[in-house]
């Protein structure tokens, strides 16, 4: 990104990655692609002679992302799983202001990936208007896991749940390169729901960057891959309840697994981490 307005630099690459994965994963300041007479490239470093100089390139933006992840890992006591570290970074990345427009939504995952990570301090401390829930486990074939929880009381008004929810799922499925584009052999899905008065479930969540023109039901496999990130180890979902839900019954976070045909059965299961952030967008609760 440019240091002046966080827009794309002239040398920014555009995704997609292999197996249609989101690439780039993140973006960060890389310096202007030209020399400005006042600020140079806007990104400064120290050369071999200890002199301050200006540079640009992905070789400078990538270490800034890696530094943030390293600081997060260092400040957490004990061993942190790979899935949890990645989930923390993805969950706490934001869309730079220059890209926060409706007309850019369908292009963002190929331009900025999951966004620009915030600081390690903010990742670990959050803010006073949100709460983070972390679910980390392993899931075996043909199994599903259900986590029940209650919506924060401060966000329940008139028997309706308000607020904003963002969910990041990171897993490490089996990979077999002999299958080419189908190398990822396992897929995890996550749903967020409430049980209605008639006993049926009301499902929420929408994949990040999903094209609103794509229908919600009856999607073809290619649509599930492109829009719902099927067979992707990283999935991000978001939902804002501006008008509140229809009721405030207990919530269920459900994780399910599906495998490709002829997949090698793993006895330990696929490791995963889910981070769910519930926040008050009005900054009052």
Over which residues does each language-model region extend?
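C-terminal edge strands of extracellular/lumenal beta-sandwich accessory domains
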Residues: 183-198, 239-285
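Catalytic-core environment of secreted peptidases
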Residues: 1-62, 79
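Short, small-residue alpha-helix embedded
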Residues: 61-76
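An often Trp-containing, charged/polar helix-loop segment at the C-terminal end
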Residues: 76-101
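Charged/polar, low-hydrophobicity segments characteristic of intrinsically disordered regions
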Residues: 96-116, 199-214
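Extended, solvent-exposed segments with strong compositional bias
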Residues: 128, 134-135, 200-244
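Residues within well-ordered beta-strands of beta-sheet-rich folds
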Residues: 27, 164-170, 252-254
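Secreted peptidase-domain scaffold signal
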Residues: 105-196
């Amino acid at each position: 990104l440019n240091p002046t307005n966080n827009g794309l630099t002239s040398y920014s690459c555009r995704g997609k990655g292999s197996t249609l994965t989101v690439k780039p994963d993140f973006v960060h300041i890389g310096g202007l692609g030209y020399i400005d007479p006042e600020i140079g490239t806007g990104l400064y470093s120290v050369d071999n002679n200890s002199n301050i100089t200006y540079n640009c390139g992905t070789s400078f933006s990538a270490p800034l992302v890696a530094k943030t992840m390293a600081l997060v890992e260092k400040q957490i006591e004990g061993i942190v799983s790979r899935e949890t570290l990645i989930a923390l970074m993805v969950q706490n990345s934001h869309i730079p202001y220059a890209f926060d427009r409706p007309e850019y939504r369908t292009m963002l995952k190929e331009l900025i990936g999951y966004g620009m990570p915030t600081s390690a301090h903010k990742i670990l401390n959050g803010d006073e208007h949100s709460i983070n829930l972390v679910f980390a486990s392993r899931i075996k074939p043909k199994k599903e896991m259900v986590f029940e929880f209650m919506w924060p009381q401060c966000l329940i008004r008139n028997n309706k749940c308000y607020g904003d929810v963002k969910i990041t799922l990171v897993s490490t499925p089996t990979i077999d390169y002999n299958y080419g584009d189908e190398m990822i052999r396992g897929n995890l899905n996550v749903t967020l729901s409430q049980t209605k008065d008639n006993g049926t479930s009301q499902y929420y969540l929408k994949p990040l960057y999903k094209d609103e023109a794509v229908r919600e039901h009856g999607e073809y496999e290619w649509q599930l891959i492109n829009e719902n990130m099927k067979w992707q180890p990283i999935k991000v979902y978001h939902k804002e309840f501006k008008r509140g839900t229809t009721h405030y019954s207990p919530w269920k976070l459900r994780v399910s697994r599906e495998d490709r045909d002829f997949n090698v059965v793993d006895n330990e299961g696929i490791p995963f981490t889910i981070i769910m952030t519930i926040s008050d967008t009005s900054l009052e609760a």
